[in-house]
Structures are given as structure tokens and as C-alpha cells.
């Protein structure tokens, strides 16, 4: 685990974005941890979040031309990541996002920001079922662009309805790499460093045994 990944886990814990306990997910699964990126909701949170996304992006080495943030959650993430890349990595890259409702006046269409062209890096909070990615792919392909990769905050590394995870399905279906700031494996490594969190570690490991990929 890299220093920025450990810092991200501590940041998420401090904001209660990441919580350990017993939670029922939308799928009905009982999970020993919960991650709600919507709680990164202040200016300082967003500034820090962008730096973590930018760090993971640079660390991945994937080449791309534009950041795309799917509406709605992806919009502030794409924006703050673009700012962080410019301020901390000297990479001044265009960004774009879609609006769910097409406008009938002013600037046309349902895209805001730079023209959607070239190799696209899609940024979002998490991938649960991959629906937002599929909708985004239609927009990307309709504009003649290609998907270079997908960047999210957390990869839960767990099976969906079948034998593979929603993330593995996206990688298979679109022949792209999905990268994340942290994974379930990183969470476990972090818990292993914290003796006071031993009960959570046991629960998360048991969960991985049952649902992990």
C-alpha cells in the first residue's frame, strides 16, 4: 500500500465516508463496511479528494486526453481531479461532463465543458452495477471518442450476481482498465496495521472469503 492510499483511508474514516460495522447493501448483502463518497461534501474535502484521484491517475501510467465525469456524482470529481492534475502534477487537461436533461436553448446538446474527443478517462465515485459506465460509453462512442480507462475511489473486489465483479465486467466488456484509489485488499492491509480494529479485520476477511473475487 502506497502512502497516498493509507492517507485516503484515514481521510475517508475521518469524514465517516468509510465506516466499519454491519450494513445492508442495496443488493441485500450484509457488509462489514460501508463507503459513502457523498459525505465528501465541503470545499476542503473536494480539494483533497481531487489530489487523491490525481495521484492514483498519475500512478496508473495510463495515457489519456480528457477527463469525463458522468452526471451527477462524477461532475465534481472530474472537476476537482482536473484542478489537482494542473496544480500538483503540471498536467493541464480538458474535462467534460454530461447533463441528464438535454437543453433546448443556449449551448446545444447534453455535454458541458471541452469537446468529448480522443482517449477518455472516466472518473466516478464507485462502480456498483456498472450502469453509469454503460450510459457513459454510449455518449463516448456517439462522439467518436474512445475509453482509455475508468478511475474510481474504491474497488470492493466482490462478485456481482455472477462469478466476477461489476468492475471485471466493465473491463471485459469495454476492453479497458479500471483503476481505483484503494481496493478491499488495501482496506484489509490497513486494518492489519491496527490491533484495535481486530474485530473489523476478522469480519472483513470473512466477507472477502464469501463474496471476494
Swiss-Prot record:
Keywords associated with the record: Glycosyltransferase, Magnesium, Pyrimidine biosynthesis, Transferase
SUPFAM superfamilies assigned to the protein according to its UniProt record, in alphabetical order: PRTase-like (SSF53271)
GO MF, one example: orotate phosphoribosyltransferase activity
Binding site for 5-phospho-alpha-D-ribose 1-diphosphate: 26, 72-73, 99-100, 103, 105, 124-132
Record's catalysed reaction(s): orotidine 5'-phosphate + diphosphate = orotate + 5-phospho-alpha-D-ribose 1-diphosphate
GO BP field: 'de novo' pyrimidine nucleobase biosynthetic process; 'de novo' UMP biosynthetic process; pyrimidine ribonucleoside biosynthetic process
Cofactors named for this entry: Mg(2+)
Protein name in the entry: Orotate phosphoribosyltransferase
Organism of derivation: Escherichia coli O45:K1 (strain S88 / ExPEC)
Amino acid at each position: 500500500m502506497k502512502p497516498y492510499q493509507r492517507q485516503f483511508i484515514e481521510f475517508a474514516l475521518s469524514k465517516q465516508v468509510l465506516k466499519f460495522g454491519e450494513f445492508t447493501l442495496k443488493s441485500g448483502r450484509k457488509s462489514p463496511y460501508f463507503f459513502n463518497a457523498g459525505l465528501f461534501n465541503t470545499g476542503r474535502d473536494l480539494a483533497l479528494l481531487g489530489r487523491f484521484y490525481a495521484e492514483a491517475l498519475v500512478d496508473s501510467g495510463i495515457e489519456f486526453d480528457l477527463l469525463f465525469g458522468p452526471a451527477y456524482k462524477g461532475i465534481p470529481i472530474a472537476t476537482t481531479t482536473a484542478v489537482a492534475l494542473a496544480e500538483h502534477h503540471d498536467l493541464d487537461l480538458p474535462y467534460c461532463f454530461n447533463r441528464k436533461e438535454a437543453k433546448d436553448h443556449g449551448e446545444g446538446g447534453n455535454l458541458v465543458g471541452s469537446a468529448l474527443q480522443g482517449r477518455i478517462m472516466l472518473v466516478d465515485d464507485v462502480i456498483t452495477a456498472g450502469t453509469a459506465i454503460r450510459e457513459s460509453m454510449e455518449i463516448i462512442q456517439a462522439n467518436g471518442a474512445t475509453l482509455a480507462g475508468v478511475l474510481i475511489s474504491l474497488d470492493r473486489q466482490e462478485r456481482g450476481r455472477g462469478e466476477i465483479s461489476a468492475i471485471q465486467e466493465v473491463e471485459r466488456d469495454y476492453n479497458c482498465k479500471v483503476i481505483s484509489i484503494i481496493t478491499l485488499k488495501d482496506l484489509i492491509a490497513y486494518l492489519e496495521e491496527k490491533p484495535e480494529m481486530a474485530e473489523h479485520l476478522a469480519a472483513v476477511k470473512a466477507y472477502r472469503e464469501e463474496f471476494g473475487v
